[in-house]
């Protein structure tokens, strides 16, 4: 009887440890003087889950050698963070450094790089490591891993967490694109889908609606006709294109039998729904878009 009890207790502990490891954090946000948003959590940089492993987070952004940075797992201070440990650590390209949680070490020491540049950053919360290397694209500083469209014209309405993702293009990651069904209404562009309305938005230039401004008065774009649109945002040239696509032949009154469903990873690549690896995905079913998490 005692052996059975101990065996069951051990199995429960192993299961609990496995669950905790598989869900080390739901999000990872970069803050610090090394990134454009500084210490503003609202403007923190969103790292994206790897489709292969939900405990691996990736970002390609500009890091300033004159500042330091660390990682938050929530949108508030005083919770679980990942930092450098006992001393600040200057990261070396392609060399793994320890990612130390606040549960292990209370010292608020941070990471830095020796040269200002765009970097590929990979954080593995299972292995507790961080690896950086210079990104292939260095033409302009990269501020965002993605952008999100919100507003009454978008599928998610004014819910920032349900914003429609604009993904960076491969050749030029300062240009972001999405194809989305819009309705009559307003929209603007968020830089962080994890925080709130205190963040800085890309907004309509009142002198030219094909131009954007970053921050300032809350001038939004107006969509006057429901339809399927290609949206392209260029954060260097500060331009936006909202172009209605050609009709696909699908009626606006969709039924279960004629709705087309597609699944995409966070890189904007279409994937099969069979044998999905753990990670975050975007499902588009007709005019509806939702986020799916596979554990």
Q: Residues of each region from the PLM?
A:
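Hydrophobic h-region of N-terminal signal peptides that target proteins for export
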Residues: 13-22
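Short, aromatic- and glycine-rich surface loops/edge beta-strands on solvent-exposed regions
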Residues: 69-71, 189, 279-285
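A recurrent domain-boundary module in secreted/ectodomain proteins
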Residues: 125-140, 230-249
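Bacterial N-terminal signal peptides that target proteins for export
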Residues: 2-13
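A glycine-anchored, Pro-Gly-centered beta-turn/N-cap motif
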Residues: 65-67, 115-117, 183-185, 225-227, ...
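C-terminal outer-membrane/trafficking sorting elements
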Residues: 247-295
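Append "Rare intracellular matches occur via the same short Y/T/C beta-strand/loop motifs
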Residues: 119-121, 229-232, 278-287
């Amino acid at each position: 009887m005692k052996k059975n009890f101990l065996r069951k207790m051990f199995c429960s502990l192993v299961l609990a440890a496995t669950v905790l490891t598989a869900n080390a954090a739901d999000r990872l946000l970069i803050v610090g003087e090394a990134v454009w948003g500084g210490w503003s959590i609202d403007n923190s940089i969103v790292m994206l889950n790897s489709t292969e492993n939900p405990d691996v987070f990736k970002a390609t952004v500009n890091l300033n050698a004159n500042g330091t940075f660390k990682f938050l797992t929530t949108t508030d201070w005083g919770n679980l963070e990942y930092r450098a440990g006992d001393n600040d650590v200057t990261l070396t390209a392609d060399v793994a450094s320890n990612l130390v949680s606040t549960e292990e070490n209370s010292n608020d020491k941070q990471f830095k790089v020796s040269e200002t540049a765009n970097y590929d950053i990979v954080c593995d919360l299972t292995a507790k490591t961080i690896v950086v290397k210079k990104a292939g694209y260095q033409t302009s500083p990269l501020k965002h891993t993605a952008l999100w469209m919100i507003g009454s014209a978008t599928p998610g309405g004014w819910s920032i967490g349900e914003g429609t993702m604009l993904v960076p293009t491969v050749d030029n990651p300062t240009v972001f694109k999405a194809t989305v069904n819009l309705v009559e209404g307003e929209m603007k562009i968020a830089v962080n889908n994890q925080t709130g309305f205190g963040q800085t938005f890309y907004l309509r230039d009142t002198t030219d609606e094909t131009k954007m401004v970053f921050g300032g008065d809350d001038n939004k774009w107006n969509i006057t006709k429901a339809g399927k649109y290609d949206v392209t945002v260029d954060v260097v040239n500060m331009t936006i294109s909202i172009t209605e696509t050609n009709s696909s032949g699908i009626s606006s009154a969709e039924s279960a039998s004629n709705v087309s469903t597609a699944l995409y990873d966070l890189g904007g690549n279409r994937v099969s729904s069979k044998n999905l690896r753990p990670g975050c995905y975007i499902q588009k079913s007709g005019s509806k878009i939702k986020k799916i998490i596979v554990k």
